[in-house]
Amino acid sequence: MIYMKKLLQALLFAGFLPLSAQTVVKNSNWEWHITQDGYTDKLIFKEKGGSDTIPFFKNQKNDGPCFYIRMDGQDTRGKWIPDGEQYTFRTAIDGVECRILYHVWNHQPAMTVTMINNGNVPFQPDRAGLKLGIDTYMDKYPDWFGKYFPTLMRNEKTHFYGYLQTPKEHTLALVSPHPIASWSVDYNLGYMDPKPFWFMGHRIESLNLDLINALPLPERNPQNLWQLKQGESKTWTIAFVNIRTLDNLETALNKVARIPLIQMEQTAYRPGEEAQFEVIGEKPIVKVTDDKGNQVLVTLTKKAVGRYLAKVVLPTVGLYQATVIDGDKESEAVLTAHATWRWTLEQARKATMKYHQKATSHAESWYGFYSAFIAGRYFPDSSIDEAVAKRFDFLYDLLHDKKEVKPLYYGSRIQNTSTTIGMLVDKYEAEGKMEDLEKASLLADWLIDHWQREDGAYVNRHTVYTSVIYVAKSILELTLAEQKLAEKDSRWKSAAERHYNSAKCAIDQLVHSRGDFQTEGEMTFEDGMISCSALQIGMLALMQKDETLRKYYADAMLEILKSHSCLTQLRVPDGRRRGGTMRYWEAQYDVEMLPNMFNSPHGWSGWRGYATYYAYLLTGDEEWLKQTFNAMGAFSNLIDYKNGDLRWAFVVDPYVQAVQACSHDTRFTADSLSFGNPQPRLYDTRKLIIGEQYVNMISDWQTINSQDNDVHELFKCIGETVLTNAFVIERPNGEVVGYNCRVSGKGNTLTVKADEKQIVNLHCNLKQPFSVTFGGKSRSLPKGYCDWAFGQSGY
């Protein structure tokens, strides 16, 4: 309490606190309105173009900031009462007192929080801290465009930072110069099935800063904030920072809190490539180690005051930890040198047989065939390809009426049929069997006849399902295969036109929706419906020969894709996670684990990967290609580079008290039909702590419907974007760089060597005229060339 009073007196004396209004803390750039109950009513940042008001929950259970304690899995919230001084409040729960002071700190709105254990024994909660009260509840269009999604929260040993972002790309950063144990979010409940067991919902009710948290925590987190001894107190200052552009995040936070930060534009590299990253700090010491703890030589060059460039060659496949020490502060990052794309696809194909593909109500449970057929197309291996084809045919026959060529079960789940269409096309391209393409074509006709509305939308009864596992993209994939046969067979020409027109109508409906999309399950600003809408519009744009139409669709796609940034890990300095999208309700269905947790990357992160790839081809903006390759590097790490085994997803949350089913359903085998989402609590379960880690697959032992094979979307995405494609870019400063290739040359002559044998397509994005040699062939390309120069990649 003495500390708080001295701090308050100092701030008043310095003129940082206004004396006029009891409920408003402000300076020239912002106003912070505090209610009589100690909660935030609103936080307004003033800008030249207008004001940005940060929404907070009002008169709800999620009002904040609110002190809370979780013990034995149950939350208790404290109620603030005035503490006798302006802008200060206090509360107590079971002998633990918390005091909060709202004030100006380094020109930013800030809270200083002190927690005191007045009890007679140590205080060791599950967690204790603040529910911030920022409105994160995205439940309806168009309201969700103004809500803040917790995009990045990062605990370091000595400090904390992160940011929330809206779909309109307004960014609110959080920063503390003090170590914070952990963070968490509260998710809504979804539905009971069966009673009394709950599945989790699709919305976020609260972002929590957990100042004290039980162990274990990830190694990067503080390891000494798991208790308060009797009589002990700890204090934290937490500031809110208005970030105008995300590129300015690290610089702005360093300026406010004087913490060292690592800024990485690229997180994924090939072995032997030189990695670069910027370090923001005063006198940083930088160390890079491999996963065995061996140091790798780093060179550090000063670029400007407080900015340094680090360079390091990553010698072999693996993960590399970068550590920056600046004074008494320490930050960490992870770089990845990824395995070859060929090895990645070959291991994914092996996983298709190890982790059973099963005939269920959900296409996710047989998604592995995508990886297997793509690998079989480029790297045929009869010893496994024949077994894969046999397994696919077995499941297809279980799930379909072979005579009428339609699904036997759950026909309204049209994503099952569109996924099967895509797999049949890939199987046809791998094996050349016309019967597979014919099945795909007939299934597309059935889907269109039964589930396409007059306005073009593909639907499940009354809900638009076009962007539930990209139904239109699967039909366009079929169209492209049919078009190759159309010149010799009018039947295929007719089918290609029919299917293209259908998919185009569905995508046009998405464009006209202007972001008012629908999806499966509970409505929210949902990662998949946004990225799948963007990717399908982008794919259609690439198929347009008319430049006006191409631009029309490209502009629509880019608007949607930019809104998706708030759901994507675009700034996290971690190559395992970069480019992953923030899904959080899949664990209960995929690996039978509760409660919700952020899975990133998850299989559905691949949907954004297609979209950024298409965005690059449409615009030539290297930023989209960087995002694509960073994501592909993260995706490839779902295959453990040490042993080739497949993992399901990476969990981002630092600390989740989880429960997971640990026994198979003895009534079924992997060859049985099984329908619906099994409730994990109906089986033997095991309690476990999950935090910043990969989670294993379960389909090798779980016999009923489990959807962990959706991870294979990542390898399908790799197969369509980077497996066979290289890219050369001339940057504005004249530097020529390659992705998936090495570029050499002199003057206006370039020689390009692919990183892998199967890379046979080269896209060039050049400002000046060049003569380019690739794969033993040469071409002269004119000024401003931005297109495929050798080969022609699909979409």
Question: Which positions does each model-derived feature cover?
Answer:
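Beta-strand-rich binding/interaction modules
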Residues: E273-T299, Y320-V324, I759-S780
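Beta-strand-rich N-terminal accessory domains
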Residues: A21-T112, I116-M192, T237, R742-A754, ...
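Beta-strand-rich interaction surfaces with strong enrichment in secreted/lumenal proteins
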Residues: I100-Y102, Q223-Q227, V298-L300, A310-K311, ...
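Beta-strand-rich recognition/accessory modules
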Residues: V24-N27, L130-G133, Y137, Y163, ...
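Glycan-recognition and catalytic cores of secretory/periplasmic carbohydrate-active enzymes
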Residues: A304-P315, L319-Q321, K329-P769, G775-R779, ...
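Short, solvent-exposed loop/linker segments at the N-terminal edge
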Residues: Q266-E273, S361-H362
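Bacterial Sec-dependent N-terminal signal peptides
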Residues: M1-Q22
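Beta-strand-rich extracellular modules
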Residues: I116-N118, T323-D328
